[in-house]
A protein has these predicted regions:
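Short amphipathic alpha-helical segments
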Residues: 46-49, 71-73, 183-184
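Phosphate- and divalent-cation-binding pockets in alpha/beta enzyme and binding domains
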Residues: 18-21, 44-45, 68-69, 115
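Internal anion-binding site segments
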Residues: 166-189
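Active-site acidic Asp-centered loop
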Residues: 36-37
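Short, solvent-exposed amphipathic alpha-helical segments in soluble enzyme
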Residues: 25, 50-51, 121-122, 186-188
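Short Gly/Thr/Asp-enriched flexible loops that form oxyanion-binding sites at enzyme active sites
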Residues: 41-53
Length: 189
């Protein structure tokens, strides 16, 4: 960023929630807020920026163990190239959703296998990468239960739709894959 003439501040996350907190506290002070990390770090940053009311742009340098979201929107897997794209002002427009009071632009999900991303220790992610999530998912198979859910889309609009069912897994998604495992039809996303 410095090579491109950008004045930068660097904050290092040490625990879950830090990216959300930092983005919420400081987004109004910057033209661009960017993170280097995985899909979870990016999701936290989005929630923090949107909940702060800031109008800044956001950037994502995919540097985590899966980087599913970055891949699905065509970001470079090379962190230097991804950083250059941000510094050069390259942008794409993305939708942001709200799910139970939290903002997201990748996926909000519930049910089977969704706890894996939170329960895998960081050191195992560092050692095994994406495989750590798969192994946790296999471990979680024995505890899968359905949940009764009610989903309201376009609430208050003429196109409002209510879906109420018992589901094992559900997701609201803005990408062509979930967790690097479930691939979706790009025309339906």
């Amino acid at each position: 960023f410095s090579d491109a003439g950008c004045l930068t501040s660097v904050l290092v996350t040490t625990k879950s929630g830090d990216a959300r907190e930092f983005a919420h506290l400081y987004a109004n002070d910057y033209d661009v807020v960017a993170c280097a990390g995985g899909d979870g770090t990016y999701n936290e940053m989005i929630d923090g920026v949107i909940s702060s009311g800031a109008k800044c742009k956001v950037g994502y340098i995919p540097a985590g163990s899966t980087n599913d979201f970055g891949a699905s929107i065509g970001l470079s897997k090379n962190i230097i190239e991804a950083a250059k794209a941000i510094a050069n002002g390259e942008t794409i427009t993305l939708d942001v959703g709200s799910f139970n009071g939290q903002y997201f632009s990748y996926v909000a999900s519930f049910g089977a296998f969704t706890s894996a991303s939170y329960s895998v220790p960081q050191n195992l992610k560092n050692i095994f990468g994406h495989t750590a999530y798969v192994l946790q998912g296999i471990k979680d198979i024995v505890s899968i239960k359905s949940q009764h859910v009610k989903v309201i889309t376009d609430e208050g609009l003429p196109t409002e739709r209510v879906i109420e069912e018992d589901l094992v897994f559900g997701a609201v998604c803005n990408a062509t894959s979930v967790g690097g495992v479930l691939k979706l039809d790009s025309f339906r996303v």
